[in-house]
Amino acid sequence: MKPLLELPFLSHGHATLKDVEETVRFYREFLGLDVLKTSPRTLVARLGSNTAIVGVTLGEKGLAKADRPWLRNAHFGFDFSTGDEVREAHELSFSHQDNFNIQNVGDLLEGDEGPSFMLLDQDGNYWQILENPIGGYSRFFDGECDTKHALVSFPDGKIQSQTSILKPQLMSHMTCEVIDMDKSQALYENMFGIECVRLGPKRMLGRLNSVAVIDFIETDTEIREHKMHNHIGFDVAGPEIVDAAREIIIENQERYGFEVIHKTSGSHGSYGFTFSDLDNNAWQIEDYPRGGYYWMFEQGGDLQNKFQPNIGGVDDWHKLVDPVTYEYVGVENR
C-alpha cells in the first residue's frame, strides 16, 4: 500500500548540547564522527552514511528545565565489527572519561548479538557502542533499499581514516520508544512509508532508504514530554511539498493520534515544521536537498555563514540545487 506521505530518506536525529565547542571535540576526537559547525551554536555530524546527528545548543539552564528520563531510550548507536573492538572501546572510555567529560561509562553487557555498553556524555545524551556486522542492521531486512542519497558521499562504502580514540565503522541506529508497537507500526508504515521489521513483541527496526535505522522499543516510561528538541527528521524537495505534507498530517490527525502539529517556519536555513505522534515522539519534515545535510560536508569545513554554503557569492543553498532533481550540484544555477 502506498503511504500517505512520500518521504525519500531518513535524514537526521536531534541531540541537545551544553557547549558546542566541547561537543565538537567529543564527537570528533573521541567518537570519530565527521562533524562540522553550522553556526556558533549548532553542529551536524555523521558516520558511514548521510543520516546525520543535528546538535543544537540549549545551554545548562535550558537542559535543566526539561525533565527527560526517556533520553536513554533515545540514544544513537555505533558499530564495531568484532567483540574485542567493543571491549577495547570500553577500556578506552574509562581511560579518557575525564578528558572528555563523560558522565558515565556503563557496564559491558555480553548479549546474544555480542558485547555492548552505553556512554552518557557531558550533554546528557546516550551513546551505545556495540558489536554489529558490517552493514549494520540491514541483514534483518528483505532485499536492498535505495541508498543512493544515504551513501552519495561514500561511493566505496568506506569512511575517512580516523585519528580518534574510538574508531567505530558506522552510526547504525537511533532509538525511539513507543507505547503500543502495533499501533505505532501502522503509523510508521502507512503514514511515513518506513519499512519495518519486527524483532520481537516489543522491538522493531525501521528504515527509509537508509543505512542507519530507527530501533523502536516498547516501554512503560511514564514521563514522555520535552521531545521536540530530540526529534527525528525527513527531508522533502521543496517548500510546497512541506506544506502538502503538513496538510496530510492535519487531515489524519485524529486517525493516527497526532498530538501537536506546529506551524511551518523558516529556521536553520530550511523551511519545515515539527509535530508529535501518539507516543509523544517528535518528528520534522523540512525542505532540504536530496541526501539531507550531506551538502554541508561538501563545503570544506565549518560553515562561515549560518546554515549556508561557503561558496563565494552564494548566500542560499537553494542556488546550488538542481531545480528539477533537487540534487546538490555545487555550482550556482543561473
Predicted regions and their residues:
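Short beta-strand/turn micro-motifs at beta-sheet edges
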Residues: 1-2, 60-66, 160-163, 217-223
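Ordered, small/hydrophobic-rich secondary-structure cores
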Residues: 6-16, 25-28, 34-115, 233, ...
